[in-house]
Regions:
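Terminal leader/tail segments of proteins
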Residues: 1-92
Length: 92
């Protein structure tokens, strides 16, 4: 398991915003003590799961979630609506 701070566009490590990679290549975005996103490694693509409660909890969470996913909030909402992204409880 590997834990790293998310980096700003200037390369600075951001406190309390983490990317976690497990031993099978799944990646997680954690903001403070809450899991926000899980990228499930499916060999040649990632299946995205978002925490149903915290995925859009605050502006700060959203800013770093967007960096982690490489997209805007508008794109994320479209993918949730289409079913491409799954809302689930990542903090149970």
């Amino acid at each position: 398991m590997k834990v790293e701070n998310i980096e700003s566009s200037k390369g600075n490590k951001i406190a309390n915003q983490f990317v976690i990679t497990d031993d099978v290549g799944n990646q997680y975005f954690q903001s403070y003590n809450s899991m926000i996103v899980k990228k499930v490694n499916c060999s040649n693509f990632y299946k995205i799961e978002l925490d149903q409660k915290y995925w859009n909890y605050s502006n700060t969470t959203g800013k770093y979630r967007n960096i982690f996913l490489g997209e805007t909030i508008t794109e994320t909402k479209k993918k949730i609506k289409s079913g491409e992204y799954i809302l689930t409880d990542l903090n149970k």
